[in-house]
Amino acid sequence: MKKGTVLHSGISSVISRLGHTDTVVVCDAGLPIPSTTERIDLALTQGVPGFLQVVDVVTQEMQVEAAILAEEIKQHNPQLHETLLGQIERLQQHQGNTITVRYVSHEQFKLKTADSQAVIRSGECSPYANIILCAGVTF
């Protein structure tokens, strides 16, 4: 459910169509995106825009009740993982709800992207910088 204003029409459109438990993926530049899933490609060059920046903008407009990460982020990108968990904590406080964070293998994560409403590709070039955001309700 939409909460604010995003300038990118594709992102705004996807968020406005979300129902409870629908998912949106924000990913790094390397995640394979199924041909059957809507692709919103923001990647301009390596690192632009960054993964955390895209997650921040998307979650300003999207009500989130859960997030799914690849288990591998803990070992292979611990600094980004900790920063992302902090971002999720701040989002919980802003929304006034608890956001459940679950972990799956990277292979399972890639399979789950096929069920999402869209995959938003950032320019991030660090390992396992991917998240599945599960839509909540604003009431």
UniProtKB/Swiss-Prot annotation:
Catalytic activity reported: beta-D-ribopyranose = beta-D-ribofuranose
One annotated GO molecular function: intramolecular lyase activity
Pathway assignment: Carbohydrate metabolism; D-ribose degradation; D-ribose 5-phosphate from beta-D-ribopyranose: step 1/2
PANTHER family the UniProt entry points to: D-RIBOSE PYRANASE
Subunit structure: Homodecamer.
Family statement drawn from the similarity comment of this UniProt entry: Belongs to the RbsD / FucU family. RbsD subfamily.
Protein name according to UniProt: D-ribose pyranase
